[in-house]
Amino acid sequence: EYDIPAMIHVSTSVNPAFHTTGAHYLNADTTAFMQLVQGDLFTDFPTLRLVIPHGGGAVPYHWGRFRGLAMALGKPPLEQHVLDNVYFDTCVYHQPGTDLLYEVIPTRNILFASEMIGAVRDIDPCTGHHFDDTRRYAEAAGLPAHDLAAVQEHNARTVYPRLDTLLKRQGR
């Protein structure tokens, strides 16, 4: 009715065995995706759009596992079953991790995201840059210009159509 997407983002963990940003967030992102694979949410709500942060947790790294599990569960291919409705953001603090996200997940399903106060606030001694400088990772990924523009702007306008309408009214 409101045409507003939802972001699946957890809060802190009270269990000291689960570090909030190093384990709990990434576990929850991965768990959310698996629940979408197991279920049929988008059959009932075909226009619902969900954003999973942090590059989807372990999703890109284990894409083959999720494809196989979908098959074992008798679900359609992931591209049909979830990717028309699920998007991943680029809050991944490592160039090879960001590159894997772009290699595995279709560009149309990736939204640029930056941090205000990131999970890691330090400078990476290997690169000399802040770990959470997500723009630098996107620009260094070697994407064609049209794919980079999609990730940095156009996909967000698709996922957030009310924002697109507002920006168009402002001539942007």
Listing of model-derived features with the role each one plays in the protein:
Residues 1-111, 169-171:
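Catalytic pocket-lining loop regions of alpha/beta-barrel enzymes
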